[in-house]
């Protein structure tokens, strides 16, 4: 790993925060939502990447804005069913997510919608040993990068050049500490360092 990559990563990495849509599963076109397991298409290499993080002893937490709940497009129970099915798929690969935290609200109605800190605070309440200094935030949008930066967490942009990339991804590339084309490549960098 180059020194320029290594200098951005925490010395004692303990927790990896992951955005969901666009990192773990394929991102839907703007205005469309993952509403069921049938529309949750796992990105290549994701189960194996998460298994590698688990084997390295790292805590893996998903933090996700799920505005579609507030819009009435799906329910919190629908999201839970998706996450249970995803955990089963991960289990088949010797992997797991330690916790899922999601914001079910529309814009400006809460403190938990990324980039606000509420999802991080929920994670710390459940796992008191979490520290921003030993965490990494991996996401595919400017909101994910801003979330991490506001908290002082190292940020990694998954820049897959998807046709469904979030607006502002170019500026997120500039402000992220690091960027990689896939979760697998980001995990490679993390595990070489830790």
Which role does the model predict for each range below?
Residues 114-148:
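Conserved Lys-Pro-Asp/Glu-containing loop-to-beta segment of HAD-superfamily phosphomonoesterases
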Residues 2-61:
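Active-site neighborhood of HAD-like aspartate-dependent phosphohydrolases
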Residues 34-41, 74-81, 114-115:
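Alpha-helix N-cap and loop-to-helix initiation/capping positions
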Residues 86-91, 124-127:
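Conserved hydrophobic residues forming the short capping helix/wall of the S-adenosyl-L-methionine
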